[in-house]
Amino acid sequence: MLKPVRFAHTKPYWQVLILILLPLQMPERTLLQAGESSSSATSSSKHQSDTATPQIFSADFENASYGIYTKEQLSLDWNNPSWSDGIEEKRVSVVATNRGSRALAVTFPAHTYGPEKNGAVWRLKFDASYPAVEARFDVMFKQGFGFARGGKLPGLFGGKGNTGGDKPTGKDGFSARMMWREDGRAVQYLYYPDQPDRYGHQIPWIDPTTGKQIKFQPGQWHTVVHQLAINTPEKNNGTLRAFFDGKIVLDIDNLRFRDTDDFAIDGFLLSTFFGGGDASWQTTAEEILFFDNFRIRKIPN
């Protein structure tokens, strides 16, 4: 039995989404923290000098207007990213959910793949580097979601946040995203100097109770948590732990993310698209997934 991995139409589509997701009655709560203002402590990374408040970032979209998620709202919520995919293309919306809150909905058009045509990507750059960080968020794939060959999900990064076949050297950066694979199987997707191939290292998430690989269930909210601690330069003592709906599903304690102290954990990569870099990864129909309740905080190293 496998064990948890140890290395040791006629309406705008956002209106249709609201009708799909909510048995009506849109809430009017105003709990948004990410978009309060660019100088707000909770809008990005303004509390890192406050030892009593380890929070780096939070976003729950309760103050965001329903409809297309604009470039202006992205800038306000996510510490002014320098670039993005999917925002100007209107593939991201704020919608009402079936649990009485607001969430981001990301659309993947039919017969597309890659971030230029499909999904959304941007980077939240922290205002400081951190040695150990926890990132958590809620995610739901729409009912009947067609997983195809798989696609990307968010995660932490450092330095230039290597992706796209850019294997880290130890002196440039790393990334620690996720993927879904066929049938919704969950894997960690790591770019780090010791990865075995050019493209990211896929490490299965394993249910500690059943020994089976974790799967995302369409139509159900899941809570994902990543806990990453950077290594001492040139040493294999970095750690990565992952939790799925409260269960630990990944525990690695011998990772080398860097050979220099020029970077540590520097940001969070909101990355979701089908692919893969060729048409074998494309969607077979329009698909949608939802994100909510992002929380990123410092943790003990």
Where are these regions (language model features)?
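N-terminal non-cleavable signal-anchor helices
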Residues: 6, 17-19, 93
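N-terminal secretory signal peptides that target proteins for export/translocation
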Residues: 1-10
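Low-complexity, Ser/Thr/Pro/Gly-rich disordered linker/stalk regions
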Residues: 31, 35-301
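Bacterial N-terminal signal peptides
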Residues: 15-25
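Membrane-interface motif at the C-terminal end of an N-terminal transmembrane signal
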Residues: 27-29
